Amino acid sequence: MNFLKNKQTRSDFITYGLVILAFLVVFFMQTNHMIPRMFAGQLVPITAYIVMAISLNLVVGIAGDLSLGHAGFMSIGAYTGIVTAVSMQAAGAPQTLALVASIVVGAFFAAVAGFIIGIPVLRLRGDYLAIVTLAFGEIIKEVVTCLIVGVDAHGLHVIFNLKGNATVNDLHLMDGGIAIIKGAQGASGVSTYSTFVAGFVLIMIALVVVLNLVRSRTGRAIEAVRDNRIAAESVGISVTKYRMIAFVVSAALAGAAGALFGGNFSQLSATKFDFNTSILILVFVVLGGLGNMRGSVIAAAVLTILPEALREFSDYRMLVYAIVLILVMICTNSPQIQGFIARFKPKKKGEVEANV
């Protein structure tokens, strides 16, 4: 148990333990029908948003790059995951296998997209990087609205509907064929296959991958690039390489989250992955704390549940939501409040001796 003497390792295991405990409590309540229906329907989206927050925190909090197009990678994962799952289920594959395959495929294609986009984008920094990632996120959203995809005995049929005059009938599917993606209508008529358990497993995978990456030599190099780019270059650290690693890993996790998210809806359109979604995920990261993965998990869960909890106050729901966000930001950044909280934290041995 010597490895637990390390403060960072203990913190990571506390994070794992809290997530596992929360899952067990929610799973017990779910199996015993103790969760209201409107909240039960949000369990899979909550897990997907948590993974999205963890993945974006890797780029924004650890690498120090502001990305505003993260929902674009989520949409790639969602659409490729749906196509994979429906195709496998049509071929007779079990639902669990189709779900796992959809997540893997979604992560792969999102990672490839992240690498391709990262080549030109990661030469920029600051506001320029934010603007370009925002543009790429919107481009990805527009591209997926042009896709018409179906599957039959002959395999996949794909039409890229640039002119906007193609329809599902142009796929010429055989009898028994399934139209999966219908252009601007998105995916519709698809049976749902995502589960809360799969979402929990994906959260744990995301936490293990990101936290181990951050604690590794690669993670320290990424943080060195964030803190002082010139100093990092002077000791031989490749700035572009390590920024690319963070960007691609983040994109892959976003794609996996998108595949999980897409499998929770029988109808899914590209409007679910617009600029507002990217900003929402960024809010999770900022409120949870830049570089704080545990905070991202909590913020994503609470802020996803909050609008549903306030649904009874339909006229004032978004007003209350905004007030809560403002109060959290004030409390998080207030030195007085932080000092008050610090009084209740146990002091380290060195600090106690110094006070004596």
Where are these regions (language model features)?
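Transmembrane alpha-helices and adjacent helix-loop boundaries
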Residues: M1-V356
